[in-house]
Amino acid sequence: MAGVTSFVIPMGIQTILFPWLVAVQLQESADRLGIAQMSTQLPGLFLILFGGLLADRFDQRKILIGFHVIAAIPAAGLALLMYLDLLSYWALIGYALMMGTVGAFIQPARDGMLNRVAGDQLQRTVTVTMGLTFGAQIFGFAAASFADSIGAIPLLVLHSLIVFSGALISLKLKPAPPQPQDVNAGSRLNQIKSGLKVVIRSPRMGPALVMMMAMSTFYGGSFVVLNPIIVRDIYGGGASEISM
């Protein structure tokens, strides 16, 4: 459970701090903010299925350790750039792409590990995990709301340290070797295609997938762009207002 919060808290910080840096600090336009926000999600769109495949084929504990270490680098690098007064729009794009890529591999490994840890208490574990996730996100939002007063550098350092702590926490987990694979499953790409077909054709998972796509398309994307712009241009607000 501590491993879950070690990634969710930094993502909560990023959710507020990243658009604040783009829209408030750099005063970028709405279209450039949209591109920046898209960059945080774009790697996951193409890599999340490969992340799931990797989690099925390799030790999930090792994946979590390695990618948590890697995930600590972008925030630390961005903090260094800000300390050197070298912050730029393209530096933020690079940060977004790196974090999006890392997240595409951490999430499947974390979810797979959760299934192993839960055992026969899966429903209870999922409920507790959801509660921790919401709580950790709120903590991240609250921390990032102080960006106007303390600046971004301390928050980026905090972001990096918490993510790195996830690697240390994962060291305490038992090894999670991959489950036996079906020799008739075919190539990795065919396995991904088969998984997509199962989800799309499922009377339960298919509608849920459509609903999530609709929410992301018609609400999520516009919200993460319009909210910071409205806060900045209409209300003259900053990080604390964005976090609300």
Where do the model's predicted regions map?
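Alpha-helical transmembrane-bundle signature of multi-pass membrane transport and export proteins
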Residues: M1-M244
